[in-house]
């Protein structure tokens, strides 16, 4: 059966829900799709639809970021429901790296929790420009004074991490009641989406640069071949274009035989799209998450590079102690994390939290990087620094 075609009539924005586990992110995602479906702007998704993998449903926790599509009057959104459990911060990083804006979900009954802080910090570190706050479970925590207190606390926290805490929209609602069809709470979802439309800026897309998609997932469609999915970081791609798969393994060349977005076929994928790309003659085991799909010759894999790095202060969620040459943390580039050893410049014995430093890094596996590539450095479940590549060497 021929797939329906994706019609590009509204600007496309990538957005996501972040926040502490069990504060209601997945329920809110389901509620948004269900409320918008009544206006013909989405396909209603239940909690179980959003919470896709069986392992997630058993634990009631979202692990791999899952995508939902919907529209408002002015925009087309891809909504990623970000994992909220501490073990899955890694997924949050790759999910958040794709977000043009975020909805921070906070249960009015609990207030700000450890992961609330961590997610705001991560959103800042991966460059999410604006956050809208949804104060959830207000049907349960009905005391307006308590709601005011939580709102005040979250505004202070947003300001502390470099967001505009004073002006950020804070919507008070109940994802569960909206999902159940209560009109009072459904109106709060409309209010939330109006805030998202107006507060989260339309991203500038680099469509004129060479094509690059960071591979997030790989699967096989029987009879058709291997599909890679991910967000197009830059450039455009058409069916029959040649592409290279770069990083982690030897570079491979292939041809694009199909492009899809939200189960609809696409003539052209462009920067900002969350697309599935069908590849000719590639087996599922030949390609993996963390590689990139690129215009041939536009980017090379490197194991060694020099970078300008900022080491986070303790107050920013970073280390309490200095780092020295030989330190081996994980380096997060797009959808991959690779261990690397650092070498500090001659004459520099150690780097204190809060310092900027130029360092050389040797990764244990080659990654597709170029001058200007951004990365985070993590160790033991927390971000300890971030930086950008200033020079690559083979």
Swiss-Prot record:
Residue span, tr-type G domain: 10-204
InterPro entries in the cross-refs: EF-Tu_GTP-bd, EF-Tu_GTPase, EFTu-like_2, EFTU_2, G_TR_CS, P-loop_NTPase, Small_GTP-bd, T_Tr_GTP-bd_dom
UniProt-annotated stretches for the region G3: 81-84
Coiled-coil annotated residue ranges, if any: none
Segments for region (G2): 60-64
Catalyzed chemical reaction(s): GTP + H2O = GDP + phosphate + H(+)
EC primary class: hydrolase
Location(s), subcellular: Cytoplasm
Pfam families xrefs: GTP_EFTU, GTP_EFTU_D2, GTP_EFTU_D3
Chain segments carrying region G5: 174-176
PROSITE patterns recorded: G_TR_1, G_TR_2
The entry's keywords: Cytoplasm, Elongation factor, GTP-binding, Hydrolase, Magnesium, Metal-binding, Nucleotide-binding, Protein biosynthesis
Residues where GTP binds: 19-26, 81-85, 136-139
Enzyme Commission designation: 3.6.5.3
Record: residues binding Mg(2+): 26
The organism's place on the tree of life at top rank: Bacteria
Region called G4, residue ranges: 136-139
GO MF term set: GTP binding; GTPase activity; translation elongation factor activity
Functional note: GTP hydrolase that promotes the GTP-dependent binding of aminoacyl-tRNA to the A-site of ribosomes during protein biosynthesis.
Subunit record text: Monomer.
HAMAP family: EF_Tu_B
Family that this chain belongs to: Belongs to the TRAFAC class translation factor GTPase superfamily. Classic translation factor GTPase family. EF-Tu/EF-1A subfamily.
Name of protein: Elongation factor Tu
Gene that encodes it: tuf
């Amino acid at each position: 059966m021929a797939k329906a075609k994706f019609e590009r009539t509204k600007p496309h924005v990538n957005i996501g829900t972040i926040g502490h586990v069990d504060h209601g992110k997945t329920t809110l995602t389901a509620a948004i799709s269900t409320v918008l479906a009544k206006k013909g702007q989405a396909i209603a998704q239940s909690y179980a639809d959003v919470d896709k993998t069986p392992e997630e449903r058993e634990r009631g926790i979202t692990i791999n970021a899952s995508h939902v599509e919907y529209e408002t009057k002015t925009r087309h959104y891809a909504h990623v429901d970000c994992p909220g459990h501490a073990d899955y911060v890694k997924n949050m990083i790759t999910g958040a790296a794709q977000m043009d804006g975020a909805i921070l979900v906070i249960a009015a009954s609990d207030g700000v929790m450890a992961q609330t802080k961590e997610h705001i910090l991560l959103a800042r570190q991966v460059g999410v420009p604006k956050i809208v706050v949804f104060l959830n479970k207000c049907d349960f925590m009905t005391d307006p004074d308590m709601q005011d207190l939580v709102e005040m606390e979250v505004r202070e926290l947003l300001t502390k991490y470099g967001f505009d805490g004073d002006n950020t929209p804070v919507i008070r609602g109940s994802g569960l009641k909206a999902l159940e069809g209560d009109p009072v709470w459904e109106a709060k979802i409309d209010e939330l989406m109006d805030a998202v439309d107006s507060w989260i800026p339309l991203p500038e897309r680099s469509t004129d640069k060479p094509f690059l998609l960071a591979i997030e997932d790989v699967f096989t469609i029987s009879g058709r071949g291997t599909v890679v999915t991910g967000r197009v970081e830059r450039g455009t791609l058409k069916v029959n274009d040649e592409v290279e798969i770069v990083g982690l393994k030897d570079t491979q060349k292939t041809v694009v035989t199909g492009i899809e977005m939200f189960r609809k076929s696409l003539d052209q994928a462009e920067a900002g799209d969350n697309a599935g790309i069908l590849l000719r003659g590639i087996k599922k085991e030949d390609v993996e998450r963390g590689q990139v799909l690129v215009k041939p010759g536009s980017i090379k894999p490197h194991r060694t590079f020099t970078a300008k790095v900022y080491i986070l202060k303790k107050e920013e969620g970073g280390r309490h102690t200095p780092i020295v040459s030989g330190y081996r943390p994980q380096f997060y580039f797009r959808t991959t994390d690779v261990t690397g050893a650092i070498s500090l410049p001659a004459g520099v014995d150690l780097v204190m939290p809060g310092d900027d430093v130029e360092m050389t890094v040797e990764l244990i596996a080659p990654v597709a990087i170029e001058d200007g590539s951004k990365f985070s450095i993590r160790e033991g479940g927390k971000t300890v620094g971030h930086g950008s590549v200033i020079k690559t060497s083979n």
